[in-house]
Structure formats: structure tokens, C-alpha cells
A protein has these predicted regions:
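Core segments of cupin and vicinal oxygen chelate
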Residues: 13-67, 113, 123-125, 166-228, ...
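N-terminal beta-strand motif that seeds the catalytic metal site of vicinal oxygen chelate
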Residues: 1-22, 32-38, 92-99, 146-174, ...
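A short, acidic/glycine-rich surface segment
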Residues: 41-46, 79-84, 150-151, 193-197, ...
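C-terminal functional regions that serve as terminal interaction/effector modules
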Residues: 213, 218-219, 225-236, 250, ...
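Vicinal oxygen chelate
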Residues: 6-16, 54-77, 81-110, 130-134, ...
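Short, structured interface segments
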Residues: 71-75, 127-153
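Intrinsic, low-complexity N-terminal interaction/targeting segments
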Residues: 118, 123-125, 201-212, 234-246, ...
Length: 351
């Protein structure tokens, strides 16, 4: 059986204070359901943590509106190292995380009322979608993007819809994201200066922007919840890009990875090796993370940006009753019933 990508499960966000960050993302971006909250040792990420295990605390926060969540991650065995420079468009790594909304103006007005740092006004992207950019209190940039596929109603903003990634060789990067991750449709490709990014660091440089999405609807257990996704690639042409994580560890402040929910890790491993991007980390099939369990792996894109894959085995639906779902007993392509996923909303945490 071929591997299945159900969607973008989460974006990893390294922070200095996990509790404060969870509270901010809960209040401002609606990430109010903690799937797990765990303090443990990150013993398997040695290529990216200085060659030795590091202690950490992580909270996976999601919203039942639809879209991926945030894995909010803090070192506890060392002082998190902040970047020494302000990343700009085209720098290598995850520069921006995309968050979906069904009402761009309402989300803009809400965040403005909460005195969030808004980098742009609402404008139209080259894709034709309405969007705007903001910066959180920790220096991370988010793009709020208009989408029409949502799992439930309620507040306008949903979850993670994708990322903006800096690359050096556009054609090589496109091939990677198309071949392995299934983002086979080019929505736009432009070298022209775009006013929609005016206000975003580095937007005044000569940039090539490419937006990719997937032509086929995602399938799998969480596909209805995660919905459609997109990847925007940016290459800067009039300066030398820097690595956003140069001189720092994975888990230090910033966007540390983009994670995809998948089925059939063995088939994915074969495909990644054939494409020249073998797993750099393999957590094994019996890994547990708090109240969730699964198999996680990592690969690098052509410029070293970390992509995580998680094949979920067990997930808490209703913690108070000890109700957990074992996904190993379900067909790989079949979406979970909506009523079942909605029970996760009963784990909502007010701040």
C-alpha cells in the first residue's frame, strides 16, 4: 500500500515559555485544545540538539474549527537561544506559518482590537485570496489566509494551513514538495514585486514566490479536520540568504518544523530514500508523547528545512473519561466520523 498524507498536522514553534505561549495562541489564534502537555527528554533528535539528549516541555494545541495545530516546544535543560538576526523573506527555513480563516476582515479586526502587531492591512495575494500578516510577541510571523474548507463553525480563524519556506533553488524545491508531499499544483509563480507583502521583513528585495497546493483532496483519519494545505516557496535574488537556525538548535525560538499526518510509514520511508531525502531521525513505531502515541520521523528539504511525519497510533478523544482512539484498528484512507473528532472539543481549555 502506498503512503497517505492526511494533511498538515501541526507547525512546531520553539518558545522560551511554553505556558505563556499557549495562553497567547489560545486567546488570539484559537488554539484552545491541548492534545498533550508533556515534560520529557528529547532523546532521539540528536542531529539537531547538539548531539545529546535535551529535556523539554511540549504542548500540542489544536482547534476544532479545522486546520493543523501548534506544537509549542520549550527547552528545560538549557536556556533557549534566540536568533541573533531578524529573518527576512527568502532566508532559509520556515519564515511564516499560514493560518486559515473564513473571514479575513473579522479576524483582522479582532486581532487589532487585541492590540496584536499587524504587519500589513488586508490585501489580495497573487492567488486571489484575501490575507494579512501579523507578528506574535515572540517575533514569529503568521499569515492569516482566506479558506473555505472548515470542519466546524464558530470563531473565524482556524488552524495551520501551511508555511512560507525560504529556498535557494526554486525548481529543486518545487520538485521536492511535489514529489514527496503531494503539492502538485502551482497556484502562482511570480518574480514581480508584490505589494501584498509590504510590511513583511525583506519584502523590498527581489523575490521569486511560488505557491503550491494539492489537486487531490487529502484522505485518511484526520483529513476532514486538517483540510487543504499550501506551501509558499520564496527565493531571494539580490542578496545571500541566511539559515534561520544558523548556530542554534532545533527547538530554539522560531518555527522548528512542519509536521504531516501520514499513514504507512514504511512506504513513506522507501519513497523518501528513492527521492534522495532519507529519514534523518526515526523515532520508531512505539513512541509515546504524553497521552498520544505514534511513529515520528524527519527529513530535510533541499535547503535543510525540517519536515516531520507522524503516523498516529493513539489519540485522546475525551481525557476526563479516559477515552482514547486506537487508529491501528481503522482503515487507513477512511476519515474519522465528525462526531468523534468533535468530542476533542470537550477538552477545550479556557485561559
Amino acid at each position: 500500500m502506498a503512503y497517505i498524507i492526511s494533511g498538515i498536522q501541526q507547525a512546531g514553534v520553539g518558545v522560551e515559555n511554553v505556558e505563556a505561549a499557549f495562553k497567547w495562541y489560545n486567546e488570539h489564534l484559537g488554539m484552545d485544545i491541548p492534545v498533550f502537555d508533556e515534560a520529557a527528554e528529547a532523546a532521539l533528535m540528536l542531529p539537531y540538539t547538539g548531539g545529546k539528549p535535551q529535556s523539554r516541555r511540549a504542548i500540542l494545541a489544536i482547534t476544532t474549527k479545522g486546520g493543523g495545530g501548534f506544537e509549542i516546544w520549550q527547552y528545560t535543560s538549557r536556556t533557549p537561544v534566540k536568533p541573533t538576526f531578524k529573518a527576512e523573506a527568502g532566508d532559509l527555513g520556515i519564515f511564516i506559518v499560514k493560518v486559515k480563516t473564513d473571514n479575513v476582515q473579522a479576524t483582522f479586526d479582532y486581532l487589532k482590537s487585541k492590540q496584536v502587531k499587524l504587519l500589513t492591512n488586508v490585501s489580495t495575494a497573487p492567488s486571489g485570496k484575501k490575507h494579512f500578516y501579523l507578528e506574535d510577541p515572540y517575533g514569529n510571523i503568521f499569515e492569516i489566509v482566506e479558506f473555505d474548507d472548515f470542519f466546524s463553525t464558530g470563531r473565524a480563524q482556524g488552524g495551520v494551513a501551511g508555511a512560507v519556506v525560504g529556498v535557494t533553488n526554486m525548481d529543486r524545491a518545487i520538485a521536492f514538495y511535489q514529489q514527496i508531499l503531494g503539492f502538485d499544483k502551482v497556484v502562482f509563480r511570480t518574480n514581480e514585486m508584490q505589494s501584498d507583502m509590504h510590511g513583511v521583513p525583506g519584502a523590498n528585495h527581489a523575490l521569486e514566490r511560488v505557491l503550491l497546493t494539492h489537486s487531490k483532496k487529502r484522505v485518511g483519519p484526520f483529513s476532514e479536520l486538517l483540510g487543504r494545505g499550501e506551501i509558499e516557496l520564496i527565493a531571494v535574488r539580490d542578496r545571500s540568504p541566511r539559515k534561520i537556525y544558523e548556530g542554534r538548535f532545533w527547538g530554539d525560538p522560531g518555527f522548528i518544523h512542519l509536521c504531516f499526518d501520514i499513514r504507512n510509514m514504511a512506504a513513506l520511508k522507501t519513497a523518501c530514500e528513492a527521492a534522495g531525502h532519507p529519514f534523518t531521525v526515526d523515532g520508531g513505531a512505539g513512541f509515546e508523547m504524553g497521552e498520544a502515541a505514534g511513529h515520528f520521523t524527519y527529513i530535510e528539504d533541499p535547503d535543510g528545512t525540517l519536515i516531520e511525519f507522524v503516523e498516529t497510533k493513539k489519540v485522546p478523544l475525551l481525557k476526563k473519561l479516559g477515552w482514547y482512539l486506537d487508529l491501528r484498528k481503522r482503515p487507513a484512507e477512511k476519515p474519522l466520523p465528525k462526531w468523534m473528532l468533535r468530542t476533542m472539543g470537550l477538552n477545550r481549555k479556557k485561559v
